[in-house]
Each structure stands twice: as C-alpha cells, then as structure tokens.
Curated annotation (Swiss-Prot):
Role according to the record: Guanine nucleotide-releasing protein. Together with GTPase drn-1, may regulate acetylcholine release at the neuromuscular junctions probably downstream of G-protein gsa-1 and adenylate cyclase acy-1.
GO cellular component terms, semicolon-separated: plasma membrane
SUPFAM superfamilies membership: cAMP-binding domain-like, Ras GEF, Ubiquitin-like, Winged helix' DNA-binding domain
Organism listed in the record: Caenorhabditis elegans
Protein name: Rap guanine nucleotide exchange factor 1
Range of residues in the leader sequence: none
CDD domains: CAP_ED, DEP_Epac, REM
Amino acid sequence: MERIVSRVRRLSPLHTFSDALLISLLSESDFQPDSIQQGVVLFEKDEPTEYWYLLLSGEVQLYSKTYTGDFNHLKTLRCGALFGDLSTLTHSCSCLVTRPAQLIRIAQNHFLSVYNKHGDHLQPFIIIMHDILTDETPSDPIHPHSSGLFNGQRSMDLISTEINPSEIVSVSTNGMLSKMILPSIPNQREKPMNRVVVNQQKNEERNFIEFHNPTGIEKQIRDSGGILHRKMLTDNHQVIRDITTEHTRVQNCMIGAEMIDWLLTLFVSTSTTCSSLSRIQMSAIWQVLLNNGLISHIDGEHQFLDKTNSYYRWVQQFRSRNKVAPSIEEVSKSITLLSSVAPETLFLMIVSKPGFERSPEELEVVYEELTFIKALSHLSTMVKRQLSNFVKVEQYVHAGSVVFRQGEIGVYWYIVLKGAVEVNVNGKIVCLLREGDDFGKLALVNDLPRAATIVTYEDDSMFLVVDKHHFNQILHQVEANTVRLKDYGEDVLVLEKVDIPRGAALENSNSCNFNCGYSVMAGKAEKILEYVLETRIDALGDDISELDVFVEDFILTHDAFMPDNTVCNFLKSYYFRTPYRATRDSITDSCTEEVRCKRRVVQFVYVWCSLLRVNFFLNPVTNSFVEELFCHVIDDRKRLGGMEDILTRIGSIRSTRENMQLVLARHPAIVLDCGVLSAHTPCPVLPSDVCNQIIYLADTTCFVLPIRVDKTAEEICELSRRRMSFSAEPLNLVEVKSNGEKLIFSPNDRAIPTVLSLNSKLYVVNREEIPLLVPMEDQNGPTPSSHSSILHLIDSQELAHQLFLFHLQLLRSTDSNELLYQVIGRESFPLSMPFNLDLLVRRFNEVQHWSTTEILLATEENRMEILKKFISIATIAREYRDLLTVFAITLGLSHTSISRLTLTWSKLPPASLKTFSELENLLDPTRNHRMYRLLVSKMSSPYIPFVPLILKDLMFIHQGNKSFYNGLVNFEKMHMFAKIFRSFRQCKSQMDNGAEHEFIEPQSLIRNLRVIDNQKKLMQLSYEIEPKSAPKRNVIFH
C-alpha cells in the first residue's frame, strides 16, 4: 500500500491528496497496477460501469462512434487522470489505450462511497466521462503524435518556452508575439508599446492551431522501408541471399557492410540534390529501420553495425508482396525522409557508447546535435566540443520516476532531451522543466546537497547527463582559458581563449597563421571597442565579405549597450589619442603610432557603414560624424606622413554617404493607403514615408489623415484634433480589433499604422468614449456572397512565384538592426523604428489567415480543390525557398476551423495528404526546431526565413541572459544575438552583393489579400460547413 500511495502522490495533480484520502480510495484495489498494451480497448460505450480508473502512466483516448460508424475523438488522458462515470449504469463513451499504460481499477461502488464522503476534495481532480460527452463546447483534440510548438504562454512568457506549432497563429511586431502561439500574433509587443488592453475576449484565449499529422511518422518510416525492400528485391545487386557463417547457413539475409554500400550507391543514383551522406549516416538509416522492427539482427542485437560479420534480414511480417520496382522519385523521397529522422537515432547511438569508443566523426555528430540544445546555446564552441566526449544519455520509462531527491549528493548535471520533469522543493511543486532545460548544475558547482527533488512528468523522459568529474574538469579548463584585464583593481575586460577560424584577424596582425586567439566574454563598453580597434582592425582588408567575426558582432549589436553617439565620441577621442613618448629617439615611432590610431578609426567607420549601408546614414549622429572625420583627415594630412591611404578610405566613405543621401532625400512615398499596401511600396520604408490612415471617431464618422510613419500617438491625436471640434481635453489613440479587443496606445508609441492588426480600425476619442467602441460589420472580412478569389485566376506555380517575388522584396527591405530594435524594446530606439519588419510580419499573418479564409468561403464543390491547391502552393514555395509562404499556409491549414473539416480532408488525394504531413513535420518543435534548422542549413541564398521563429530565438536569448553583469557588458549574449543576425543577413546575401538588383514587380493581385482574422467568425463558418457532430479528422487509431 505504501509503495502505491507513494507513486500516486508523485503524479500531478494528485500530489495534493492527503494520505488518508489516497488510502481510502485505493484500499479495495489491487496494489499491483494493470499493464495494458497499446491498441487495447479498455471498455466500450454501453458496457456496464464496473470501475473507475487511475492512470499511472501512458495515455488513453476517450471516443464515441457516430451514426455512420466513424470515430469521434472526445479527450486524451495522460498519467494522473482519474476517470469514470458517476450517475450512469453503462459507460458513456469508449476508451482506447494509445500508449502502453499502467492503471489501477477502483470498484464503482467503492468509488461512489468515497465520493459521497469526500466529493468536495475529489471533484476538481476527477474526469466524468458523461460530462465530456454532453459538453457543448468543441473539444480540443490532441493527436497521440502531436506536440506543441509554442507552449501556450501569453505575451511576455512566450519566448521563455518552446514554440509550439500547435500554437502558432499569427505574429505581430509592436511588442513581442502577442500569443506566441502565434495565433494572430497580433502585435508583437515585448513592452507592448506600452499599450493598454481593454476587455480582451475570453474566447480568444483558446489555442486555434492543431497539429495532427494525418500520416504519422511511424507509418511514413514503414512506407519508406517498404520501398527500399521492393527496390532491393528488384535490382541486380543480390544483397539478399543465403550466407554460410562459421556454424550454420542463414537464408535470405544481408551483411551490414554490404547494406551500407548498396544504400550509398542507391542514394547517389537517385538523389536530385548536391548533398551527400556518409557511411555513418547510412548506418543511422538502417538503425531507424531496425528500431522500428522492419529489419532484425539474426542474433537479436539492437545496434546496427557496419561490419562484414553482422547479418540482418527483413522482418517476415513486413516483407512486401509487391514485386514491382519503385520509381526513382519514390526511392529518393524515401531516403530523404529516413535521412531526416536518422540524425536523432545516430545521436542516441553514439551517446550510448563510452567516450573513449567514439570516433572523431562520431564526436563531430554529437557536437552538431549539441548546437541544437537550448540549455547549451550560451556555451562556447570549445566547451561544446569537450562535452561531446563526456555526455551520456539516461531514460526513464514511466512518469513519476524520481531522478534524484532533495538532500542527496549531486553526481550529474542533467539536460532534458525529451519529456518533462517536476521540480519539488519541500513537498511543493515549484515549476515544470521541459525539453531544452537543464537542472542539477548548482549542486555540482557549489559542492552542496541537492536543493530539490526531481520527478519525471511524462513517460519516456530522456536526459543528457554529464558526471561531476568531467563537469568540474570542463569548468577548470574554462577558467584556465579565461583572462581578466583590470583597471584600478576592477575587471574591465574578460577574454576567453578560443579557436579562430582561418582568415579571421588575430591579436597579432603579422602572424595570421595562428590557430587560436581571444574572444571577449564581458567588459566595459569602451574597453570592448578599444579592444576591437587595437587587435582586429589592422588585419582587415578591403573585402568585408571575410570580416572578422568579433568586429561584425560588435557592429551588429552595439546599439544594445553602446549608443551611436557614445561610439562616435570614443572614436573621436581615439583618433586624437596622443602616443606615449619615452625618449627623443622614439619620435618617429610615436608618429607612426599616431597614424595607426587614425587609420584604425577610419577603417572601423568604413566597415561600419559598409555593413549597415542606408541604416548607418539614417542616424544624424553617424551621418554628421563622417563629415567631421573627413575634415580631420584633411587637416592631419598636412602635418603627418603616411595619411594617403587613410584619405582614400575616408573619401570612399564620403562617396557612399553622398549616394545614400540621394536615397534618403527621395520624395516621401505612400506605404499604406487606407490600410492597403500601395502599388509601389518603398524599398525600404523610411521615417519620412507616409501612410494615409483612416481615423474614426466615437460616432463612427471618419476622415483620412496623412501620417508620417515615425509620428507618435500623441502627435497623431493633435493632428486629428485640427479636423475635429474637440476642445483641449486629452485624446486617446485606440485600436479596435475585429474581435472587439481594444488597445490604447501610449503617447510616445510610434509606427502606429504599420503595427495595426489586420481588419483593425484606429479611433481618436476621449477616455469616456473608449467603453463605447465596438467593431464594425466590415471588420469581419469578406463574406461568401461578396468574396472573389484570386485562386481561380492564377495557377499554383504562378501564385507561388508571385508570392516569392513580393516576399523577397519585403525581406530585402528589412535589416537585421530592426530585429534588435524589436527584441530589446521599440521604446529604447525612438529614432529607429522597425517599419519594414512590421510589414514582413504583417504579411505572414495575412497569408496565414488568407489560406484559412479561402477554404471556409469556398463552395462545397470547390473546397477540396482549394485545399489541394494551397498544399500545392506551399510545396512549390518550398522549392522557391519561400519559407514564409510555406509555414504561413501550413499553419493556416492547421487552424481548428480547417482541421476539423473531416469530410473535406477525406476527399483529398493520399499524395496531397502525405505532402501536407511532410510540411507539418518541418514545424516539429523538438530539439529546438531541429527539422527547420536542418532544412535552412541546406539552403542557398536568397531564401525567405520563418521570421516568427527568428524573433522567438532572439527573445529567448534576451529574456534568458542579462545584458550587464556587475557593470560589464555580457558580450556572450551579444555573440548569440549576432549569430542570428548573421544568418538573417546571409539569407539575402545574394541580393545585397549586387547579384540581383533588378526585381520583377509582383502582380498587384497578391499584394493585398482579403481575410477574416476573427477567430469566432472562422469557427462559426466552419460549423456551418460541418456541424459539431461531424467526426474529427485527427483521430487515428492504431
């Protein structure tokens, strides 16, 4: 009894039950839990009610059958669920075990007697099946294989957790990801432009994105394995044959090494890309098939070996009866799918080995995988490579297993690789840690007992672990590689010894063959800049394409810790730095040193303006500094020798300035005309550009007001006052969304027109009128009777191409600096608003809602064809490397209003279903969105990235790392920022390098899409198409 009570107590939420209640509840039950295999029906509807059930581990689904005999999913239950029927003599629904489960049966009569005494305590924790069945609200289906991409946290919490595809709905830019669940990510506001949210609709709290994956990954692996089996049977290599070993003759088997050779040859002959796979990667593919029971070792071994004395055979039950050779396309897709799954398997294979058995190639694989783990993102390359030798894996099969207890001596550092754990301090659960989080480090660092008890929260939780000895060894090596520079006894610069990539500048510019140097970890802002000038600038040449990484990191991130005016002031003081003269003989050397200081400043400014281009000259401080520096160089040339090359370089900078001034001095362009993108959107949008904004009053009358995009909310109110008969009473600028939500802008908020949500209206009213504001009818978007679809006018290929051209134009206008302004906080950069990023994110939301709207407004005859066409557009967009379109459409089709349309999905061809499943797999959030990052790593520029994920990564870094420690800039955080900024710049590098200056103007038809963004309206249309009683598409029974 004590053992079972202890196990139950570890389950959430039952840990709040008293011992007396648990003992009373379980007193007549068998203390040995029942183990039920996957696929077993626990009970069916209308069977006599005999038990209540307490789920200790695993997962079950409650479902019912419709009059057509189809399955209707009701609810998924996981460990800790206590479920049954109270007032019915027969079961209200059926129950299927979807993951191997352990449960305790509690006799119905006994449970009712306990419930009559302790109903107040039990009621919040029990699941009454009859209530689920009669619930009028639509259930939130959870497919056994689904997982969340943006763990439903709202506004500010959003990036501190994993993004859950099940929660991406839309994005926006005036603060953060308003629901990174991106459901409409209305307006990304980290410090939401200080806007006040009034009467937010409760129905918007719901998560409207479902990831169901119509064909599960297991089935895709089996199908791919079947294709390889058919190919092996029908080619002439005779890989499958009878083999005589030392002791016996084995029929129809294969040799491990030959299987690798055959698969390598097959890959080379069928691959349509220039990528390659190594033998170790091919081994991982066979390991995947071995793990999934498609092949087996003749002696039952569980690891695939690339050896001539390892024998395997296809599993009898799996062998394909189809003897027709598969097509080249089928083989290519199968290998591609298996190769995308294989790295995970390969990684686990390697970390299961002792460190001394890992080959250099295997250590490289482990290192690459460690780069995808969130908890290790702040560690240097050197530390990650050291961890590759020591990291191991631990797995706990059942939820409720204790990893370690409070007070124990710490022996391991843990990183959650899969699953989740509860942190329990003094008997109270304080938090939940999920994939990518780490724990147990404090006890190792301080040599103290464990401060908490850690209990697994999910079945099959898996951890990477580093033992105490190797953990401390790495710490000591890091400390040994750390150099602290002090000034008056205080740290002013902290450096770490690191490997320097070939071609990067080193400390001694005359010794460019060194393999190591120093990277800045932290320091005073001025000392970091001085370190850049002293150690990196001398080695730079004219070609900034091979720019020193540290110099680039500083320039891309300095706005976060050192404003432009501070940088310019320090450069000016460094330019006039007086060299120290020890003797008269050193006068020549001092003159040389003086010239060197001036050269460094001019070279730094050259790199700075070359990287930022027009954004450098947008700032009046840096713009005027160039002219001032030019005058100083002219004067110094008269008295110092060796200034000719400096004059040439500053002249080049000045010429660039004159060219940029022509861009900045262009006539103001119209960006948004009454909420619609103008026919020729400026590229990029400048602060002087204009939006013709419709301003509404409380009585719903309106007028059009031309507004510069950099105007504040207060200035817009004052401009509006001139058009109104208002007295001097204070006015408020209010956004009213289509769902009725009202957001009040603070007086200093800027870039108002570009951050408005789709279908929103902007009001200027006094405070008493705010409660009277309601959405208008036209904010609901198009209706079936008024909607005219462009899908009937343009084919999929052309649509995807036009979307790519337009999105490429928006991407080209967006600079990496805008990402920094957005994440640090827009209010911190009043002169540098991310207008272009606003438009890019606005477009993501627009395409996402467009795909949902078009399907819901389509006629019954055309709906399936429209759905099929969107899948086709997303597929072609992937070929164009337009990931914005790919993921916006995928998320739009995953909206609950679409995913529940079972009858529509059932008409879709299997090939389209499979294609959509592959698109959904790209949004798999595991291992820090590993699938997406691998996809991007193989792409050549230009490509259009998944912008919401970039913003999520940056916000996670910003919220998880302080910008300053003890007065020193945390430059390791800046290194992490810069790495993302570099990848963002890289995705459009071909455009920026001048390879593609002439863009084909996209058709106006695709620039502005009419959409419905009101979640309630979308669900209403969905229920009109298929009422609630219709079976749900995402219920899959195995």
